[in-house]
Every structure is written in structure tokens, then in C-alpha cells.
Amino acid sequence: MTVRIGVVGPGGMGRAHIDRITGELAGGAVVAVHDIDEVNARRVAEPIGAKVFGSATELVASDAVDAVLVASDGTAHLEPVLAAVAAGKPVLCEKPLAPTAAECEQVMAAEVAAGRRLVTIGFMRRFDASYLAMKAVLDGGELGEALLVHCRHRNPSAREAYRATMAITDTAIHEIDAMRWLLGEEIARVRVDVGKSTRNRFGHQIDPLTLLLETISGVRVDVEVFVNARYGYDVQCELVLETGVVSLGDQSVVSRRDASGARHRITSDHNDRFHAAFNAEVQHWISAVAAGGGAAGDGAGGAASASASTAWDGYAAAVVCDAGVRSLAAVLGGEDDGAGRVDAGGWVPVSLAQRPALYA
């Protein structure tokens, strides 16, 4: 079976997914696209013979579309995701699932009403070979339990439209989900620290900043977010265990040593660094849909994959992000956020709704 895929948002990340589905992966074909920029939609659709739709809901409703991939701006995710669930069609949604935790709850409610999981979130680090190897060491238990995690997320530059809060909601959200998945537990509280900012930023940006997470069992995670680092796209993670340390390797094929010294290439962006992970994630989703599943690895395709994410994961990440944004607001304002939710140390508790049985 060839899965007929409709893509909402075929620019940037969406275009990268179209290219991988068309040129690298098996079992899927992009047959429909929708973009608010109709010129771009036609530019992308014409070479692959896809149909251009005037709205996301029209695309989702089409009998020619089996499954939907949503890669539009995060503020526009909710409508096509809810439409896909209502139509009983599997949907792979890039992060975030929706702009707010309340909207993520709408998606979960729709899935619960439908009685099946149809939504997969694009948290590709769960499919990255380095993160998978790190999780295997932790889960194996040979080095004891996790105590601390040190994360670094550095980008070459951020566009002017990148707001201070996006360091949490658009960038650190990947670390937030990766830590929930890696450590196998929820995050209990969040704190944001800010200090000196780089000169290489737009004036409204706070860069770098540090996000501190504490899990239910007490594991401390520090996340450095530096989106105007200039030198490249650099994601690092060090897991401190009771009798050892596990770190992500340098993401290079080769290292070079010559008269000028030793060096290796730094990746340029997320598509460069996580290309293989993106491929594995999307292939997993296509294969699950082809096998009769809804969410990746769910349903007729077999047991749910340990790497595949759900609407619950999208919701949980959104709640943590909301807490981080409140902490940042308190730090910048120098006072409580007005709702009594920030303690004297700047920590904001994370309060999750009861997990529906569908996501157990």
C-alpha cells in the first residue's frame, strides 16, 4: 500500500519532509499540499504532481488523502489536526502540537472521543541514534540511576521575529520532550535564568538563557539555549549517572588532523544534524499508517513504538513550556507572575491533567 499524504505547510520543514518522502523513503507519496502562500504551494506541488488545496480543512477532507503531515507555523496547527482526527485520518504534526496546553487538551479530548490514537508529534530526537544509545545505557542500569543532565542547544542565528519566549516554546521544547522520554518521568518544576546577552542578537531577544528542569524523582536538568551562537548548529547532552557519564558524540563523519591542528565539521542546522532521525521518524509513521495504525506504531501495525510520541507528549511539553514562560516573566519583572505560581527561588510547578487511559 502506498500512503497518500497531504502536507499542510510545504515551506521550510514541510518542504524538507516532502523531499524525504519523495526521494528517500518508502511507502508514501505526497499527493496534496496547502500553504497560505499559494505561489509556494504551486511551486512545490507541480514537480511531484500533487494537488493544491485552498484550505487545510479541504485537504484533510479529500478522499484522495489517507494521512496528513502538518508542518505549518505552530500557531496554525490546531485546526488541521482536529480536522484529521474528526476524519479518522492519521496525522504527523510538527512541534508544537498547538500553541497552548489548553488547545492540546482539545486534541486529546477529540482522540479520546474517537477511541483511538491518530496523532503523532514530530519530536525527532527520539529517533536519533545517539539519543537512543544514551537511553539504552540508562535503561540497562549498568551505570546506576540518572542524577543530572547537561544540555546545550545552539543555533547559528535567529530571525528578527524570534521572540524571547520562543527560546522556550520553539527551541527548548525539544530538550523538554527528549528529557521526559530519556528519563522516563515527568518534569515537576521549571526555572529560567537569564544573564548577559550576546551582542549578535536583535534587541528584544534574550540570548543565551538557561532553563532548569527538575523531574518528579529529583533529577536536575540544565538546558543552555543560545540561538545566535554564529559558529553552527550544536546540540549536546551529557547524562551523569551514579557510576559514569554518557555524552552525545560529536556529530561528524570524520575528524581531521593536520599541521594546523585537529578539527571536525559542525553541522549547520537541524536538518543537517538530525537528517537521519527525521528520516527514521517519518518512515516509521508511514509504515505504521500503511499497516493500518493511527499514531506511529499504534494499532494494526503492532505495539506502540517506544520512540513514537503522542498527543499526550505534545500536551505535557506544552505545560512545561507554559511554566517556563511564567518563570521568565517573573525573572524579567522581578516579581511573582501575579498568580502566586512562582516561588522565592523562581521555580514554577508543572501541573498536568490526569493522563487519559488512551495514552497509558
Swiss-Prot record:
Homotetramer. One of its GO terms (molecular function) is nucleotide binding. Belongs to the Gfo/Idh/MocA family. Its EC number is 1.1.1.18. It is an enzyme of class 1 (oxidoreductase). It catalyses: myo-inositol + NAD(+) = scyllo-inosose + NADH + H(+). InterPro entries: Gfo-Idh-MocA_inositol_DH, Gfo/Idh/MocA-like_OxRdtase_N, GFO_IDH_MocA-like_dom, MI/DCI_dehydrogenase, NAD(P)-bd_dom_sf. This is Inositol 2-dehydrogenase. Keywords: NAD, Oxidoreductase.
